[in-house]
């Protein structure tokens, strides 16, 4: 038996080359201006006109179909039950490793989706705001595992998503500072009944152990209607992380308020060694143990090459 044929037969995804995916754009119009790309792009990530045209416009077209189908199903169920619920936002999860470009993808999707007709309200949050404060992580011995599932205030995040999905007004999310590397006290992002909410974070597709008593144990992805996993080989991710660390050493780390200010005067050799040590101790371990195993749970997988361009797209079969 041809093992490749068998693998393709049972693969839950349809896999597209970049060219095949780009052809699915159809007549979806470009609604972004060239000057917006630099504002949407994260440090050292790549975003240009061709990337938006080839990858994100087809994805925008697909998402418009998914959202429309979800709305029609919602109204059909409401009619069947004879009830009048509040509208339920469509929630999109964006997952992937540190330094893979999740934030760029999330911001591009927000910009494109907000320009659909008739101009839906599209909000974006990151799960960084639901990390425990550093004081709590220090007390629990988890500072070296910041970003691991156990470093998040999961009950608070689940309550937030439950309130959003229930259509409640003015749901608040904590604010996280990448400068101070900590939760900002008494600051909040307010989300007020969006049509679409994008939730970005490394572990948003994470599952928990199944309870033996059969009781329901919710996970973050239970609230998602669609999910995107941004993928890249580990060697590529490591290279991007080191490059980003070197850039931050020359910029943000010089701010006295920066949690990483102590790295600002490192030589290139010292900075590279430090970045690799952090990558291997924390980010690689998190990737291998927690993030990468969730990739098969995504609706769509964008696989990037070393130049930051998406090379293949995998869409889960219905």
From Swiss-Prot:
InterPro entries: P-loop_NTPase (IPR027417), PanK (IPR004566), PRK/URK (IPR006083). One of its GO terms (biological process) is coenzyme A biosynthetic process. Its EC number is 2.7.1.33. Pathway: Cofactor biosynthesis; coenzyme A biosynthesis; CoA from (R)-pantothenate: step 1/5. One of its GO terms (cellular component) is cytoplasm. CDD domains: PanK. ATP binds at residues 96-103. NCBIfam families: panK_bact (TIGR00554). This is Pantothenate kinase. It comes from Bradyrhizobium sp. (strain BTAi1 / ATCC BAA-1182).
